[in-house]
Curated annotation (Swiss-Prot):
Coiled coil: none annotated. Its EC number is 1.6.5.-, 1.7.1.17. The lineage of its organism: Bacteria, Bacillati, Bacillota, Bacilli, Bacillales. Quinone reductase that provides resistance to thiol-specific stress caused by electrophilic quinones. This is FMN-dependent NADH:quinone oxidoreductase 2.
Length: 211
């Protein structure tokens, strides 16, 4: 039995977000094929995701120097507890399903803030004399990525820092990232929206059976 963490990184409701619609198709098929697995849904825009800021970095250094957690300011304790809870939730999962849009050739800022809660030296990777070593080698992920243009291939593929960035950072910590599902090109061809979404849903169903 596997534990799946379904991470939604769009503020848009499902009826508006095409990538979320495709992700729901993926999850429905996955649950049907793997009824004994547990699925936990994390909606980032409905979740307190603390920014890795000066306050958190200072608290981390103070704790490493021997300061007691209870000696931190109450608001810092609260922020650190929320941060650590996201870290532990991520580490406890076996599989990850990310659904996220491309914003200005990158990922949503809240998704970047979330990434910072689990890409942590000593937790998901460690430094060695030979360089960084991944620690999450027995886990897998799939990325479901939406964009108005087409960036998965062709002349604009070098412009994007969305799907390639998330794939790279997950691979850096050892996670096996299977082929992504792209929901793209609708802004270029609005008349083909239904066709594009249907094709992506078909890929999602097939991918779910193998995930």
């Amino acid at each position: 039995m596997s534990k799946v963490l379904f991470i939604k990184a769009s503020p848009l409701p499902n009826e508006v977000s095409r990538s979320s619609q495709v992700a729901e198709t993926f999850m429905a098929e996955y649950k049907a094929k793997n009824p004994s697995d547990t699925v936990e849904e994390l909606v980032l825009y409905n979740t307190e995701v603390p920014l890795l800021d000066l306050e958190l970095m200072t608290a981390g250094r103070e704790l490493q120097a021997g300061k007691a957690f209870t000696d931190l300011a109450p608001d810092v304790q609260k922020k650190l507890n929320a941060y650590n809870a996201l870290t532990e939730q991520f580490l406890a999962a076996d599989k990850y399903v990310f659904v996220f849009p491309l914003w200005n050739l990158g990922i949503p800022p809240l998704l970047k803030a979330y990434i910072d809660t689990f890409v942590i030296a000593g937790k998901s990777f460690r430094y060695t004399e030979h360089g960084p070593e991944a620690l999450l080698k027995d886990k897998k992920a799939i990325l479901i990525h939406g964009s108005g243009g087409i960036y998965s291939a062709g002349p604009t593929s070098s412009f994007t820092h969305g799907e390639p960035y998330l794939r790279t950072i997950l691979q850096f910590i050892g996670i096996n990232v299977v082929p992504s599902i792209f929901v793209e090109g609708i802004d270029h061809n609005p008349s083909k929206e239904a066709e594009i979404v249907a094709a992506a849903k078909a890929v999602a169903q097939e991918s779910a059976t193998e995930f």
